[in-house]
Amino acid sequence: MTKVAAEIVRSAIDPQWFRAVLGQYPTGVCAVTAMDPDGKMSGMAVGSFTSVSLNPPLVAFLPDRSSTSWPKIERAGKFCVNVLSDQQLGVCKRFASKDEDKFSGLVYRLSDNGSPIIEGVVAWIDCDLHSVQEAGDHYIVIGSVRELQVESEDSALLFYRGGYGGFAAI
């Protein structure tokens, strides 16, 4: 496809339609947390977390380039992906907000790598920042996994068709 043809295709896709179609695919919801070199904690909610590689163990998430939380996490050079349970919608909303103190009143502990692990999560994956790639209006952030743990058998929080819920096996 030529560059001109690719541009025509790209501009012909309505962003709302694109979002509506991709909303048919359920995603897990995570809180990515970090502590910067000055000891200030930051975090953000993401619905774009995925595994990348088993060997070496790599994971990824895709923050919006306009995010105010991502630069703080990037500055830390390490982060923890907290897989939220279906009982943690409030935590999700807190980490999706512009609130500067997302950890106020929240129970957490620090990983061996120094990133916050939120109490009540289904699992957590602690990472060093491996690489960052620009991709349209987002970044692709790759983390090198240092440690990971399942914390509970609760259902993970899912986002599907614009709403939140849990998982029930059929």
UniProtKB/Swiss-Prot annotation:
pH behavior is given as: Optimum pH is 7.5 in Tris/HCl buffer.
> What enzyme class is recorded for this protein?
oxidoreductase
- Subunit record text: Homodimer. Likely forms a loose transient complex with monooxygenases for which it provides FMNH(2).
- Protein name per UniProt: Flavin reductase
The annotated thermal profile of this protein reads: Optimum temperature is 30-35 degrees Celsius. Has a half-life of about 80 minutes at 25 degrees Celsius.
Q: Which organism is it from?
A: Pseudomonas putida
Q: What taxonomic classification does the UniProt entry list for its organism?
A: Bacteria, Pseudomonadati, Pseudomonadota, Gammaproteobacteria, Pseudomonadales
Instruction: Keywords in alphabetical order, please.
Output: FAD, Flavoprotein, FMN, NAD, Oxidoreductase
Pfam families assigned to the protein according to its UniProt record, in alphabetical order? Flavin_Reduct (PF01613)
Q: Which family does it belong to?
A: Belongs to the non-flavoprotein flavin reductase family.
The UniProt record gives the binding positions of NAD(+) as: S51, H138, F159, Y160, R161, G162
